[in-house]
Amino acid sequence: PARRARLGVGRALQLTNLFPHLTVLENVRLAVQSRAGIGMSMLSLWSGHTEVIQRAEHYLERVALTPKRGALVGTLSHGDQRKLEVAILLALEPAILMFDEPTAGMSVDEVPVVLELIHQVKAERDKTVLLVEHKMDVVRALADRIIVLHNGALVADGEPAEVMRSKIVQEAYLGTPEPA
């Protein structure tokens, strides 16, 4: 994981990889410290690294978790844990962001926050976003290019509208249209 981060690749997976006994802020702070090259010492932060705390709080604000900054991660809902993982991913500032089903397990009101975050990252145009997703509405909302695999084989690659018109994609993922 550390080598991947040094190479500029960050990922947020379906199963969260967090420190459940630390607070929300502490989890993001560790990512900020790692990115800044300060290391992982929890004590070093409290001895004058206020800019690290401010940076961590910035990422919490981006994912709408500021009100939960002092909560232990283990007490968060799955959706909030997913948002926290996105905050950590952003704090690592990778060149490539990989999202595996970024909205899986989230409530209906939590999904727009993460989708908007991914839209913002894409709008900045300085990072590559790779998205693994089975919900076609999410794919259509976020993708500039879609690559579809079916049974381990590449079946489509192109712009969203083109891929969505593909007969094999429709049969495999969208269902065969009902005859009129």
Residue ranges: model-predicted function:
Residues P1-A180:
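Glycine-rich phosphate-binding loops of nucleotide-dependent enzymes
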